[in-house]
């Protein structure tokens, strides 16, 4: 590790560019408090890959070693991180990475939203509401899509997370109109009374029996508290957001936002930025693992998505420069072999790679996802005003 320590002494920052890639829901084993969340025994990665997989590049970065597979000439620095946020969802997982852990969690509505809230939404939008249950997104549009097409009513549903989702057929409610409806609902639910983390637009197309959700999803979050992205921005370090990162942080302290259609599109955009020139943080989320396969409990599809990522990963690695750092992590688990359809409370991986790394090494488990954000601040020589998390670079000196 001495090469890293020497580099840090010589220049203001060790790496000019940091690529932080979140493999949404790729957990690596039950967290110490998993039983409290009903997730004992969950292990998204291990249960997905089984004994037949083609993940050679991720294997060299140390990912598979984190779930008990044999170490094979690793090139990356790898470890697990423990969640300390009070949830097991996208927003809180990403928040924790960036130094935010809320003492009072957002509210969830496992039995549906209060009728007075539904009434307010109907009055404000001029449309009736159907659904109002906790449900799978694909399942509810199959069940209520035809009624929605006949009546124009909004399909409203939730999940185990703090979300209010509104599904609408693009021919019944055009996407831009759906976005405006979600903006209206965001204003209604922004206060402490309902305390809903995200309002999500869920457009879909097709006919009864063959409805399909489109990539035009849009999340409406609340402004996050002070976090790593704010400190980077304050110090002149830009953040490029790929995927749903800009939605999660409500576009706050983000210089460039890029939407993606799917994981492959996200990887191609990552590779394009790696080939180009920029300085700062590129923060990306690849969501197919969670949205298409985890919630649907599709182990085969989940493994295929991992193998697709593994296929494109060497192209990204090839285009990294000596002063680039790649960090691959996750925000929570979503074991496709587990009961139910919800996220699972798990450790997440932290894989670190740069062309200057000579050999791989496993580091001890991190006590919080916030160590990622603390490391990014340390890299750019920015004091950690958040007082949460410790720089992983400190381990390089041991």
Task: Name these PLM-found stretches.
Residues 2-398:
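Feature captures the catalytic ectodomains and active-site-proximal regions of enzymes
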């Amino acid at each position: 590790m001495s090469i890293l320590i020497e580099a840090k002494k010589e220049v203001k920052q060790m790496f000019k560019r940091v690529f932080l890639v979140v493999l949404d829901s790729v957990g690596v084993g039950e967290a110490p408090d998993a039983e409290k969340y009903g997730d004992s025994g969950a292990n998204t990665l291990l249960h997905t890959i089984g004994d037949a997989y083609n993940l050679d590049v991720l294997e060299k970065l140390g990912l598979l070693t984190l779930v008990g597979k044999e170490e094979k000439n690793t090139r990356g620095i790898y470890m697990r991180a423990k969640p300390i946020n009070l949830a097991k969802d996208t927003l809180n997982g990403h928040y924790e990475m960036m130094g935010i852990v809320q003492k009072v969690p957002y509210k969830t509505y496992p039995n549906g939203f209060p009728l007075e809230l539904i009434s307010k939404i109907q009055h404000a939008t001029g449309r009736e509401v159907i659904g109002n249950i906790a449900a799978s997104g694909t399942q509810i549009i199959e069940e209520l899509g035809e009624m929605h097409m006949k009546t124009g009513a909004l399909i409203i549903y939730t999940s185990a997370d703090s979300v209010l989702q509104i599904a609408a057929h693009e021919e019944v409610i055009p996407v831009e109109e759906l976005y405006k409806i979600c903006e209206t609902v965001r204003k209604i639910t922004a206060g402490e009374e309902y305390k809903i983390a995200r309002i999500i637009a869920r457009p879909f197309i097709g006919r009864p029996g063959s409805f399909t959700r489109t990539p035009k999803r849009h999340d409406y979050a609340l402004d996050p508290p002070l976090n790593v992205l704010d400190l980077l921005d304050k110090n002149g370090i830009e953040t490029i957001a790929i995927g749903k990162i800009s939605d999660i942080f409500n576009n706050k302290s983000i210089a460039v936002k890029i939407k993606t259609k799917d994981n492959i599109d996200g990887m191609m955009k990552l590779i394009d930025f790696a080939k180009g020139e920029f300085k700062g943080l590129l923060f990306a989320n690849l969501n197919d693992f969670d949205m298409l396969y985890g919630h649907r409990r599709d182990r085969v599809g989940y493994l295929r998505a991992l193998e697709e990522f593994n296929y494109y990963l060497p192209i990204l690695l090839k285009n990294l420069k000596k002063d680039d750092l790649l960090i691959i992590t996750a925000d929570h688990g979503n074991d496709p072999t587990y009961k139910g359809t919800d996220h699972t409370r798990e450790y997440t991986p932290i894989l670190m790679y740069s062309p200057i790394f000579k050999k791989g090494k496993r580091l001890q488990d991190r006590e919080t996802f916030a160590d990622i954000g603390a490391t990014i601040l340390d890299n750019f020589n920015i004091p950690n005003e958040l007082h949460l998390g410790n720089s992983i670079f400190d381990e390089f000196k041991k």
